[in-house]
Amino acid sequence: AVAPVHLDDEALLRAQVNNLFLVNDSAGACPHIRTAIRKSHDIFWQKGLIFCQALSGEHDRAVLGVDLMREQGMDADSVFFKLVGSLLGEWEGKIDSLSDPTALQLAMARAGNLRLPSDVTQTRNPALLAAIAISPNADPEIRLAAAEKAESAGTLSTESLRQIYASIEFTSEELESALTTAEAIDGPRGRALLLRTAQVQDVPTAQAEVLLAFLASARDGGLYETAAYVIAPTLVEMAPAAELIWFAEEAGRVLIFTGALEQAMGWYDLAEQESAGIPEAGQAKARLWPLILISDPEEPTPLDGAMP
């Protein structure tokens, strides 16, 4: 149930209405809008009322509201008028650009089943990004681009992001040459391809190579932390082995960062065992130990030779 909000706090009421729009609860938002419009003629409430009238079949009232807005010179928001026109059956077309969307615009586009343009993911609003990520009227790759950013901002769960990654479709040719294809296409789709490949790969060295590429791509995109949480369950199940010593440092870092310290110690132990004869192992040992110590100050593993 929606908690009542005093109308003298219009900003709070507006935030509540926007939140309802973002969770696809326009039916819950409209009663608040109809109440608010009695005390405020702010453009936000006028647009909201027109949307609610269109949703409830009050065609004539919605048209009148649009006409009044235009008479008052409030016709700068061309996207709004297109969205209203679509809901009223008076406009057919597509939204070419929506780089700075509002919660109302997203709700209207969803109600009218209008496809969201690719630039909609340029918004920096985490709540809007989360809404875009779960919008059925957005193409899968647009949803994924928004989902990566939303997870990074904390407004979308990691599991939801994994599910959106899994929804991306690929050709058999792309799947057969995942590493080279992912490098060519890069970005969210490339990462989705790498993740799909890693999850079905049963050769540990090949799986590690793909996971390393996934992390590298995410790092380049400023999404390393997000990527770490996405692949953590896979790494927890991966057994440290001598043939994977080149992967020990990266695997250990991800596991430490995501709180899987016990599994991270397995990679540290591997690096320690191989450090005498393999410089790469010694480097992994030296770099992982301070991270382990910070994560668990009571860890009894000796420091001998661990620090660079």
Task: Please place each PLM-identified region on the residue numbering.
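Extended ligand-binding clefts on enzyme/binding-domain cores
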Residues: 85-206
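Solenoid-like repeat scaffolds
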Residues: 3-8, 33-42, 67-76, 104-108, ...
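Residue-level signature for tetratricopeptide repeat
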Residues: 15-22, 52-53, 254
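Small-residue-rich helix-loop
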Residues: 282-308
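Extended amphipathic alpha-helical segments with heptad-repeat/coiled-coil character used for oligomerization
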Residues: 28-123
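Generic helix N-cap/helix-start motif at coil->alpha-helix transitions
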Residues: 5-15, 39-48, 60-61, 75-82, ...
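Structural motif corresponding to the intra-repeat A-B loop/turn of tetratricopeptide repeats
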Residues: 23-24, 56-57, 258
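Helix-turn-helix repeat elements of alpha-solenoid scaffolds
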Residues: 1-2, 20-30, 186, 218-230, ...
